[in-house]
């Protein structure tokens, strides 16, 4: 394929896939949905013509593009089945380090109000256990990974596959000293699950616990999990020596200040190792976006900077809260931030990834110094 002297202006991801009308004039093409086959077809056309030939783009499924000022959206791209047909990522093109990441599935069986995963992927699909372990081995043997995080929405969604992955990992000598991190849900964390995670060398689990208030939790997660489940998940993980990390969402439309403080209390008393808290943002493709659109808070042609809850301009970011003013929300965010810092300071020294994080940071600094020295020598 010929090399382009300038970047090819192409976009993709959940936002433009859910709202193709937001494709900006400075982008030639948007890849909608699953992108591997689509981007290959785009590049094959580019290799022939040296540019994205507008008269040929209509034959490529799963894209949006503008022609003479008009937006064209082609037929939806069919999902790749099975996912094992996808080659391993060419990680040599990336800045690899001792910290690697992997996706072993696409999609999520749940439908949280603030998350677009279910709508974007439409259904839950898995790479086979054998494929996943083969990719893990390549990451270790070829790229030197020592800590690997599963970035799936819910890696343990299929219990049998999850247990098979754990079993295969234990049979591979090259993976014997590798530590893993995964994402999970509180209602799926049982003693048996934690035992399997421990045997699989998982020492860090991230969970979207979202709230310490029952009513808010039902709004965000549809009643599939309780505050008691959240507490129990942390206790079970700690019982097996696994770090419990969590994220929370505050600022739901009908959430009161007292209910937000319930979440702060949970964070302070649950024993979590690391915490992130976010203000609810109506991202495209989510039920929250649909609600925000119904009340006129957002639109397809809005100023997208308004979705930045940390925008410095007072009153500029969109807030959906009916009971907490932007100024009050800002003060509450400071409380959560201070709680996060306190937990992080307490946990950092004992976090399973901390030694490797220090080594990776030092190696990164050393590499930067070497590059600067080489540039100066030239």
Set out the residue ranges of the language-model regions.
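Glycine-rich beta-alpha loop elements in corrinoid/cobalamin-binding modules
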Residues: 1-79, 279-281, 285
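A structural micro-motif
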Residues: 7, 28, 69, 176-178, ...
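Catalytic cores of alpha/beta
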Residues: 20-25, 193, 254-268
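Short, well-ordered beta-strand core segments
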Residues: 30-31, 205, 275
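C-terminal accessory regions of radical SAM enzymes
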Residues: 64, 243, 258-378
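Radical SAM [4Fe-4S] cluster-binding motif and immediate context
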Residues: 84-245, 265
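Conserved strand-turn element in the central/C-terminal portion of the radical SAM core barrel
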Residues: 183-187, 212-217, 221, 234-259, ...
């Amino acid at each position: 394929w010929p090399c382009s002297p300038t970047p090819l202006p192409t976009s993709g991801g959940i936002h433009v896939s859910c709202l193709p009308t937001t494709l900006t004039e400075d982008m030639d093409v948007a890849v909608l949905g699953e992108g591997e086959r689509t981007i290959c077809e785009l590049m094959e056309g580019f290799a022939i013509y040296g540019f994205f030939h507008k008269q040929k783009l209509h034959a490529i499924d799963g894209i949006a593009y503008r022609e003479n000022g008009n937006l064209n959206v082609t037929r939806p791209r069919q999902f790749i089945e099975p996912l094992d047909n996808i080659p391993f990522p060419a990680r040599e093109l990336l800045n690899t380090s001792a910290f690697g990441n992997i996706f072993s599935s696409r999609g999520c069986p749940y439908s949280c109000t603030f998350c677009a995963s279910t709508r974007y992927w439409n259904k839950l699909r898995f790479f086979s256990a054998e494929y996943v372990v083969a990719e893990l081995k390549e990451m270790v043997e070829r790229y030197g990974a020592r800590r690997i995080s599963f970035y799936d929405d819910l890696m343990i969604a299929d219990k049998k596959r999850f247990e098979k992955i754990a079993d295969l990992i234990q049979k591979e000598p090259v993976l014997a000293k590798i530590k893993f991190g995964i994402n999970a849900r509180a209602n799926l964390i049982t003693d048996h699950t934690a035992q399997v995670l421990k045997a699989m060398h998982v020492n860090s689990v991230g969970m979207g616990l979202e709230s310490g208030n029952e009513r808010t939790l039902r709004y965000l997660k549809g009643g599939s999990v309780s505050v008691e489940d959240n507490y129990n998940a942390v206790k079970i993980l700690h019982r097996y020596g696994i770090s419990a990390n969590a994220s929370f969402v505050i600022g739901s439309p009908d959430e009161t200040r007292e209910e937000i403080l319930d979440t702060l209390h949970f964070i302070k008393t649950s024993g979590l190792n690391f915490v992130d808290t976010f203000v609810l943002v109506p991202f495209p493709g989510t039920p929250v976006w649909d609600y925000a659109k119904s009340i006129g808070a957002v639109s397809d042609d809005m100023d997208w900077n308004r979705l930045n809850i940390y925008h410095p301009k007072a009153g500029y970011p969109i807030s959906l809260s009916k009971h907490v003013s932007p100024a009050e929300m800002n003060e509450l965010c400071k409380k959560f931030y201070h709680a996060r810092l306190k937990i992080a300071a307490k946990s950092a020294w004992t976090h399973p990834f901390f030694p490797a994080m220090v080594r990776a940071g030092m190696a990164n600094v050393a590499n930067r110094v070497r590059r600067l020295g080489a540039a100066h020598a030239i």
